[in-house]
Amino acid sequence: ATWNIERLRHKKFLEQILFACEQTQADILVLTETDHRVRLDYPYSFHTPPLTDLQPVFYNPTENRVSIYTNYPCVRQHKTCDGCTALCVELETEKGRLLVYGTIIGIYGNRHPSFQQSLVQQLNDIKQLSDSGIPLCICGDFNCSFSDGYYFTKQGRETLLRTFSDYDIELLTKNEAKCIDHIAVSKRFISNSGIQITEWNQDKLLSDHKGVAVCFS
């Protein structure tokens, strides 16, 4: 599951945000634009560093860009192109090893020049990680919808889809309407599992993003 909680702008709804996260019952939950005041009861959690060193005036001391919460033990962490914006852990699951790459592609949205740079760097990470032979799950804020004209750049969309196709990765949330937070998983990890997709925060009251979860059966 993944959700961008909008830098906890709506911290008066912290209890509801925590409840929404818990209700997913996700074995792997990636939060983006997140905050250490969101404390979830998982045996393992991994976080990009606080952002106050980058821009102390702009960010709260409790803010970070990506957090991964999981019920699975971590074998090791992998280096990414930008340790503040992308986080990769290798987990031991009941279906074998899985690399989870939690990310924000383009922290200022897809219209800012940094989006393309971020996209190129992160797709390079994904190519290198795919070459390791371990199945991959890319999960987070892609700043790109795929099923409609909600929010996307043509180049960004095509580049992501081409890379996923080249590396046998399925974008499971591709057909979700007005959805820019996504979950993409190596086809060999999905195998012949049934897929069920659920969303929450459709009214955007708790943050300006919907949350999305994928359940394998």
How would you describe each model-predicted region?
Residues 50-58:
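Short, acidic/turn-prone active-site loops that include or flank metal/cofactor-
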Residues 1-46, 58-63:
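N-terminal, active-site-proximal structural segment of metallo-dependent hydrolase catalytic domains
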Residues 1-2, 6-19, 66-217:
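Active-site regions of metal-assisted phosphoester/phosphodiester hydrolases
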